[in-house]
Design a protein with these regions (language model features):
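Conserved AAA+ ATPase "SRH/arginine-finger" region at the nucleotide-binding site
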Residues: 78, 184-196
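Sensor-1/coupling segment of RecA-like P-loop NTPase cores
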Residues: 47, 51, 106-110, 135-142, ...
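Walker A/P-loop nucleotide-binding motif
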Residues: 43-62
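Conserved NTP-binding/hydrolysis module of P-loop NTPases
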Residues: 10-13, 72, 83-101
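C-terminal alpha-helical "lid" subdomain
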Residues: 156, 211, 218-322
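Mid-core helix/loop region of P-loop NTP-binding domains shared across ATPases and GTPases
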Residues: 83-84, 99-142, 151-155, 193-197, ...
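Conserved AAA+ ATPase "sensor/coupling" helix adjacent to the nucleotide-binding pocket
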Residues: 93-95, 165-166, 174, 195-211
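A short, basic N-terminal segment
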Residues: 1-41, 290-298
Length: 322
């Protein structure tokens, strides 16, 4: 929509995780290193935690991208609301492995046999579980018991658990004490500092083919950085909507005035935004609002070209819709 206007080749601020635009802060680097080292050394359990929108899923996808040519067999679970049996069936399905028996015990025993054979052949099997805070304690306990399978040197199944802060709190409960004791590494992805946030935005704009100074003024970027509180997903949402608004206004670069308007419209006074609902839900709403704004501006411009009578028709239509 606004790419050619701002001299961009790609959309710089997709809300969905995109490894192509990966920006690694020090805490992101540590999380990636924890996963990489833990899996390579066959340590067993690795945990990564962090707030909503800080880039946990992006790190997982980048890890998979880096390792796609290595002898890894990966199972990526993005819906963690599973019973232990459902999790086992998911593992079997993703490994293209025929389910043995109907009982959980039979499935675990057959899976052990499979893992031992893979280990003998020099292959590593990795289970990646995103949104681990949604997994029940029963399933996590069973997973901890199952992961005890090992050779004389290594764990047979490498398990990476990625979740929000509530998952970290759950690990500190008595019930999941056994699981916590099995963790070989636990990394926390932190929010970006203001300096890192500015660097993040400029990095993405450059990677999209643009000159940051010709797309946003520095005060405009700083305003967005302050509002985002260091959460990359919020940075993306606000910047994308600022670009949409700037495009409709034919304003280049995007000014602080436009970013203030975007923040006020989508975040500043709205309790909806302040409650910090998951932005996976919020983003489509913002997109809809942006499109609505675009259509309204387009209609008004068209009406101005046609004359006063058409402008009056649009005002009547809007009054009916309110």
């Amino acid at each position: 929509m606004y790419l050619s206007f701002y001299g961009l080749r790609k959309q710089p601020f997709h809300v969905t995780p995109d490894p192509e635009f990966l920006y690694l802060s020090p805490s992101h680097e540590k999380a990636l290193a924890a996963i990489t080292h833990g899996v390579e050394e066959r340590k067993g359990f690795i945990a990564v935690t962090g707030d909503v929108g800080v880039g946990k899923t992006t790190i997982l996808r980048w890890y998979l991208h880096l390792k796609k040519r290595e002898p890894l067999k990966t199972v990526y679970v993005f819906n963690a609301r599973l019973t232990f049996e459902q999790l086992l069936r998911t593992i079997y399905r993703e490994l293209d492995f025929r389910i043995a028996g109907n009982s959980v015990t039979e499935m675990v025993e057959r899976l052990y046999e499979f893992l031992i054979e893979e280990s003998r052949q020099g292959n590593t099997v990795v289970l990646l579980i995103d949104e681990a805070q949604n997994m029940s304690d029963d399933t996590l306990e069973s997973l901890a018991m199952m992961s005890k399978g090992e050779t004389s040197k290594d764990k047979l199944l490498q398990i990476v658990l990625v979740g929000q802060p509530e998952f970290k709190r759950a690990l500190n409960t008595d019930r999941l004490r056994q699981l916590k004791q099995q963790l070989a590494a636990h990394a926390t992805i932190r929010r970006l500092s203001r300096g890192e946030s500015l660097e993040y935005l400029r990095f993405r704009l450059k990677h999209a083919g643009g000159d940051p100074t010709s797309v946003f003024t520095t005060p405009a970027l700083k305003k967005i950085v302050r509002k985002s509180k260091g959460i990359p997903r919020v940075l993306n949402v606000l910047c994308d909507n600022a670009l949409i608004t700037g495009f409709y206004r034919r304003q280049k670069p995007v000014t602080e005035r436009i970013t203030k308007e975007v923040i006020r419209t989508y975040g500043g006074r709205s309790s909806f935004f302040r409650r910090q609902l998951p932005l996976a839900v919020l983003a489509p709403v913002l997109f809809f609002l942006g499109i609505t704004s675009f259509l309204r501006v387009k209609r008004m411009r068209s009406a101005e070209q046609r004359g006063p009578g058409h402008r009056e028709e649009i005002k009547q239509d809007e009054a009916i819709g309110e």
